[in-house]
Amino acid sequence: MKNIVKIEQLELASAVVELGKKVGAGLAAIGLTGAGAGVGIVFAAFILAVGMNPNLRGELFKLAMLGFALSEAVGLLALMMSFLILYS
C-alpha cells in the first residue's frame, strides 16, 4: 500500500512540474507581444516622418531599421527564454 501511495505522489509531483514548465513558458512568451507592438510603433513613426519630410527618407530608414532590430532582439530573447523553460 505504501508503494502505491509513493508512486501516486511521484506522478502528481511530475505532473505539477510539467504544468509549471508550460505556464512559465507561456508567461515568458508574453514578451513577444511587446516586440510586435514595438515594431509597429517604429514603422508607424517612420511612415509619418517620411510623409512630413520625404528628403530625409534614407536617414530615417536607417534609424527605423535600428529600432526594428532592437525591438526584435527583445522578442527573440523572450522566445529563447520560453523555449529554455519549456525544454529544460
UniProtKB/Swiss-Prot annotation:
Gene3D superfamilies: F1F0 ATP synthase subunit C. Mitochondrial membrane ATP synthase (F(1)F(0) ATP synthase or Complex V) produces ATP from ADP in the presence of a proton gradient across the membrane which is generated by electron transport complexes of the respiratory chain. F-type ATPases consist of two structural domains, F(1) - containing the extramembraneous catalytic core and F(0) - containing the membrane proton channel, linked together by a central stalk and a peripheral stalk. During catalysis, ATP synthesis in the catalytic domain of F(1) is coupled via a rotary mechanism of the central stalk subunits to proton translocation. One of its GO terms (biological process) is proton motive force-driven ATP synthesis. Pfam families: ATP-synt_C. One of its GO terms (cellular component) is extracellular matrix. F-type ATPases have 2 components, CF(1) - the catalytic core - and CF(0) - the membrane proton channel. CF(1) has five subunits: alpha(3), beta(3), gamma(1), delta(1), epsilon(1). CF(0) has three main subunits: a, b and c. The keyword Membrane applies. Keywords: CF(0), Hydrogen ion transport, Ion transport, Lipid-binding, Membrane, Mitochondrion, Transmembrane, Transmembrane helix, Transport. The record marks E72 as: Reversibly protonated during proton transport. It is found in: Mitochondrion membrane. This is ATP synthase subunit 9, mitochondrial. It is a multi-pass membrane protein. InterPro entries: ATP_synth_F0_csu, ATP_synth_F0_csu_sf, ATPase_proteolipid_c-like_dom, F/V-ATP_Csub_sf. The gene is atp9. The chain crosses the membrane at residues 30-50, 66-86. Belongs to the ATPase C chain family. It comes from the Eukaryota. One of its GO terms (molecular function) is proton transmembrane transporter activity.
